[in-house]
Design a protein with these regions (language model features):
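Short His/Asp/Glu-rich catalytic/ion-coordination signatures at enzyme active sites or charged loops
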Residues: 3-45, 105-145, 149, 153-196, ...
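Elongated amphipathic alpha-helical scaffolds of membrane-associated proteins involved in membrane
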Residues: 28, 35, 39-43, 50, ...
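Active-site-proximal, well-structured secondary-structure segments within enzyme catalytic domains
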Residues: 16, 20-22, 49-52, 59, ...
Length: 221
C-alpha cells in the first residue's frame, strides 16, 4: 500500500482512485503499520491504559451521580414542584435512610430537570453547584487525575503517530483536517455568537426582573 501511495500520481488514476489509495494509506498509517516494534508496543500499552482509565471514568461518573443528591429538610423550599414530585423526593429520602426529608437525586446530564420548576433560588443554586462539581470534589470518585492521565496519553500517542498534538490527530480524518482550520472557523463565528448570547441574556434578565417584581422580591443578575 505504501508503494501504491508513493506512486499514486503516476498510475493514471482518476480523482476517485487517487482518493481511495490515500484513504487506505491513511488507515494503514493510523493503524500503526509504519511504526517500529518498540513504538507499536508502546501504542498497545497506551491503548490498554486508556481503556482502563475510560472505564474507571465512567464508573466514577455514575458513582458521583448516586452520591451527590441534594437533601432538603424544609418542604417550603420545594415550592414550585407538584405534590406528586415532592412525594417522590420524600420517598427517595426515606429509601435512603432519611425519613422526613426530601432527596433530590441528580441525573447524568448537564442540566438538572427540576431546576426550572423550583422557585427557591438558594435551592436552585445548591442543585446547580452539586451538579457541576461532580467528579471534582476531592473524593474517591474525583476524575481530575484520570482526565490528566488521559490527556497525557493522548498527546504521547499522537506524537508517536507523527502528529504535533492530539487535536491534529483527531481532526486529520474530519472535514476541518486540522486545529488551525477549526480555530479559523470559530473565530469567524464568535462575533455573531457573542452578539446572540448577549441578546438572549437581555431577554432572560427582563424575564427575571418581571418575575421578581411580581413576587415583591429584589431582582438579580
Amino acid at each position: 500500500i505504501k508503494t501504491l501511495y508513493n506512486s499514486r500520481d503516476t498510475l493514471g488514476l482518476d480523482a476517485q482512485g487517487v482518493r481511495l489509495i490515500e484513504r487506505y494509506y491513511t488507515d494503514f498509517v493510523r493503524a500503526g503499520n509504519n511504526l517500529t516494534e518498540a513504538q507499536k508496543t508502546r501504542i498497545k500499552a497506551i491503548n490498554s491504559e486508556m481503556a482502563t482509565l475510560t472505564t474507571q471514568f465512567g464508573q466514577n461518573v455514575l458513582a458521583e451521580v448516586n452520591n451527590s443528591a441534594v437533601i432538603v429538610t424544609d418542604r417550603a423550599e420545594l415550592a414550585g414542584l407538584s405534590d406528586e414530585q415532592i412525594a417522590v423526593l420524600a420517598q427517595s429520602a426515606k429509601d435512603n435512610g432519611m425519613p422526613g426529608k426530601y432527596r433530590i437525586a441528580l441525573v447524568n446530564t448537564t442540566i438538572q430537570p427540576l431546576l426550572p420548576q423550583i422557585d427557591n433560588r438558594a435551592l436552585r443554586e445548591r442543585i446547580h453547584k452539586a451538579s457541576v462539581a461532580r467528579g471534582s470534589r476531592g473524593n474517591e470518585w474525583d476524575n481530575r487525575a484520570i482526565v490528566s492521565k488521559v490527556t497525557k496519553l493522548r498527546a504521547e500517542r499522537a506524537a508517536i503517530m507523527g502528529y504535533p498534538n492530539y487535536a491534529a490527530f483527531g481532526l486529520a480524518e474530519e472535514t476541518a483536517k486540522n486545529p488551525e482550520a477549526v480555530n479559523k472557523m470559530l473565530s469567524q463565528m464568535a462575533p455573531a455568537a457573542v452578539a446572540n448570547a448577549r441578546k438572549e441574556g437581555a431577554v432572560l434578565q427582563a424575564m427575571i426582573d418581571s418575575e421578581q417584581k411580581a413576587k415583591g422580591q429584589k431582582s438579580f443578575a
